[in-house]
């Protein structure tokens, strides 16, 4: 389940110049490939991005923000705050505010102050992540499962937040079906703490399903009209996944940067992160805005599947992760629970095709591993949202030619 398709062969690094000095690293790859190349700075970057690029349209790189939640002068997204305690108790006003947030922004905070036990488990998982990700690479690669839903994935396996550079995060994943099954594909470290991960992920699952239930209620779905819950049957296979990410502290940009712009594949994403770096593409005001971390809050966002199932009513917002300065100056940790519909769920995608939830999942992960140039030709990475909303600056960035950084303005996008 969630295995990488054999068609995912293309890589951004296939376009390396012949004189590129490179390093070899065991990495997430097609089964027929034993290694990948990492670009060295002598080919493309002098040392790091020049300071004058800090105001680049579509690629804000403001001064480094601390890890706490104080306002640091960064351009912040104005997101609604939904109180989980009120929502689960059936507060009508809170349900209406939830519907409005999904309609208008597709992103909102979920206040979890009513769940102290869950917040304690969050700290326990962060402690686990700190220990796991600081193992040697060889040890972590033993958990590589060649899968997009379980196992370990090293840095630099997909395109990053800057043109010509790969991503710079590593991850450890555990699918819901595996956690509740025999666990044969789980990393041994996850199996050792399976009680924690089951309790932690089950609580997130309970909350996102409750959000779907409230949306069904607000829209009057049910009866003869299939509800959102109907596409998340307990007895159906799905690619719902718990993902743990680390964006390592870096000294240079030569190995990659951030997490490329995209919309999420599934129904709802439940995100926990206490550090800056997440940006959402806002409609009003138009442009990239940081999602400020809030203690005791999760960030919930609508995914492509829920947008399609809602008849394109809900907004699946484009987002990315990028350092608040040119480099990631400290390890950044985030946890995401990706709720995904049953594999056999059918919907009409942004191109007008009738596809299954599994097909959309597999195709989109393949596009993640394409080059930036190829991604710009396809609507799937951002779910067609960049064309639907016609927001300026989504493709703006940096082009690196002959070792020199060139600014791309709106006229180049």
From Swiss-Prot:
Gene Ontology molecular function, alphabetical: metal ion binding; oxidoreductase activity
Use of this protein: Viridicatumtoxin and its derivative, viridicatumtoxin B, exhibit anti-methicillin-resistant Staphylococcus aureus (anti-MRSA) activity. Moreover, viridicatumtoxin and a C2 acetyl analog, spirohexaline, have been demonstrated to inhibit bacterial undecaprenyl diphosphate synthase, a potential new target for antibiotic development.
EC number: 1.14.-.-
Entry superkingdom: Eukaryota
One of the GO biological process terms: viridicatumtoxin biosynthetic process
Domain Fe2OG dioxygenase: 235-341
Keywords, alphabetical: Iron, Metal-binding, Oxidoreductase
Pfam family for this entry, one: DIOX_N
Pathway in which this enzyme or protein is active: Secondary metabolite biosynthesis; terpenoid biosynthesis
Keyword Membrane: no
Root EC class: oxidoreductase
Keyword Isomerase: no
Binding site for Fe cation: 262, 264, 319
Amino acids binding 2-oxoglutarate: 332
Protein family: Belongs to the iron/ascorbate-dependent oxidoreductase family.
Function: Oxidoreductase; part of the gene cluster that mediates the biosynthesis of viridicatumtoxin, a tetracycline-like fungal meroterpenoid with a unique, fused spirobicyclic ring system. The first step of the pathway is the production of the malonamoyl-CoA starter unit for the polyketide synthase vrtA. The aldolase vrtJ may be involved in the synthesis of the malonamate substrate for malonamoyl-CoA synthetase vrtB. The polyketide synthase vrtA then may utilize the malonamoyl-CoA starter unit, followed by sequential condensation of eight malonyl-CoA units to form the polyketide backbone.
Name used for this protein in its record: Oxidoreductase vrtI
Organism of this sequence: Penicillium aethiopicum
Gene, per the UniProt record: vrtI
């Amino acid at each position: 389940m969630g295995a990488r398709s054999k068609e995912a062969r293309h890589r951004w690094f296939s376009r390396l110049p012949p004189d590129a000095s490179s390093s070899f690293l065991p990495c997430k790859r097609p089964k027929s490939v034993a290694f990948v190349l990492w670009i060295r700075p002598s080919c493309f970057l002098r040392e790091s991005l020049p300071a004058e690029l800090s105001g680049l349209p579509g690629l804000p790189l403001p001064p480094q923000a601390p890890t706490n939640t104080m306002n640091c002068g960064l351009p912040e997204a104005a997101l609604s705050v939904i109180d989980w305690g009120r929502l689960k108790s059936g507060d009508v006003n809170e349900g209406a505010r939830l519907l409005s947030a999904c309609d208008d922004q597709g992103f909102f905070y979920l206040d979890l102050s009513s769940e102290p036990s869950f917040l304690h488990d969050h700290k326990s998982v962060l402690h686990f992540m700190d220990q796991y990700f600081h193992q040697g690479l060889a040890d972590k690669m033993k958990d590589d499962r060649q899968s997009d839903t379980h196992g370990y994935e090293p840095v630099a396996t997909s395109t990053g937040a800057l043109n010509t550079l790969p991503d710079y995060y590593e991850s450890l994943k555990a699918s819901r079906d595996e956690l509740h099954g025999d666990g044969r594909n789980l990393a041994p470290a996850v199996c050792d703490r399976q009680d924690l991960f089951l309790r932690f992920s089950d609580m997130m699952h309970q909350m996102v399903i409750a959000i779907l239930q409230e949306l069904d209620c607000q829209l009057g779905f049910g009866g003869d009209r299939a509800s959102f819950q109907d596409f998340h049957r307990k007895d159906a296979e799905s690619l719902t996944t718990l993902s743990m990410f680390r964006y390592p502290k870096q000294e240079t940009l030569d190995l990659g940067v951030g997490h490329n712009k995209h919309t999420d594949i599934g129904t709802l994403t439940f995100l926990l992160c206490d550090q800056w770096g997440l940006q959402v593409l806002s409609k009003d005001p138009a442009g990239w805005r940081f999602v400020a971390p809030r203690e005791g809050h999760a960030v919930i966002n609508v995914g492509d599947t829920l947008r399609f199932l809602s008849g394109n009513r809900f907004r699946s917002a484009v987002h990315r992760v990028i350092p608040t300065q040119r480099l990631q100056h400290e390890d950044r940790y985030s946890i995401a629970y990706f709720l995904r519909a049953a594999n056999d769920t059918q919907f009409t995608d942004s191109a007008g095709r009738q596809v299954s939830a599994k097909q959309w999942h597999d195709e989109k992960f393949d596009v993640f591993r394409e080059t930036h140039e190829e991604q710009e030709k396809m609507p799937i990475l951002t779910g067609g949202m960049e064309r639907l909303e016609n927001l300026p600056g989504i493709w703006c960035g940096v082009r690196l030619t002959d070792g020199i950084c060139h600014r791309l303005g709106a006229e180049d996008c």
